[in-house]
Curated annotation (Swiss-Prot):
One of its GO terms (biological process) is chemotaxis. Belongs to the CheC family. This is CheY-P phosphatase CheX. Involved in restoring normal CheY-P levels by dephosphorylating CheY-P. It has a greater activity than CheC. It comes from Thermotoga maritima (strain ATCC 43589 / DSM 3109 / JCM 10099 / NBRC 100826 / MSB8). GO terms for molecular function: hydrolase activity.
Length: 155
């Protein structure tokens, strides 16, 4: 995968989490993986079309999701994954994908993003094709977020 795209992804994730949650995230070492493993119970998927075809996939635990929602609501404690919480989780992914789209535009790759899809449950599996980049992220605790960028073409 083009290093400029990897750097755009890392920058987008870092800036979005910092600006939206008010927390300086630590990004782990990006790596190319053969398939997407979902160790957590909550997933946000956003499609990417245009100059790059693929998906941006966030995953984290329900506990981490509630911390994200609380931070997005200005620190107000939130303790249930209701429609409002799931909408906020989707919006975090949407903001990350939007920032990535702007950075890709500067690289000459015009992309559009789909609305986020949020899925929760156990033993989630996602099948994706193309090159898959995994980026572990530490926000509230060690590697509590996983991010995957799956690129079928254009990357």
């Amino acid at each position: 995968m083009d290093a400029r795209i990897v750097n755009a992804l890392i920058g987008s994730v870092y800036e979005t989490i910092r600006d939206v949650l008010g927390i300086e995230p630590k990004t782990g070492k990006p790596s190319t993986v053969s398939h997407i493993e979902i160790p957590h119970s909550l997933v946000t998927v956003i499609g990417i079309t245009g100059g790059i075809e693929g998906s941006l996939i966030y995953s984290f635990s329900s506990e981490t999701a509630l911390k994200v929602v609380s931070a997005m609501m200005g620190g107000m404690e939130y303790n249930q994954l209701d429609e409002l919480a799931l909408s906020a989780i989707g919006e975090l992914g949407n903001m990350t994908a939007g920032k990535l789209a702007m950075k890709l535009e500067h690289l000459g790759k015009h992309v559009d993003i789909t609305p986020p899809t949020v899925v929760s449950g156990r033993d989630l599996k996602i099948k994706s094709f193309g090159v898959i980049l995994k980026l572990p992220i530490s926000v509230f605790s060690e590697e509590d977020f996983d991010l995957h960028l799956s690129v079928k073409s254009g990357g």
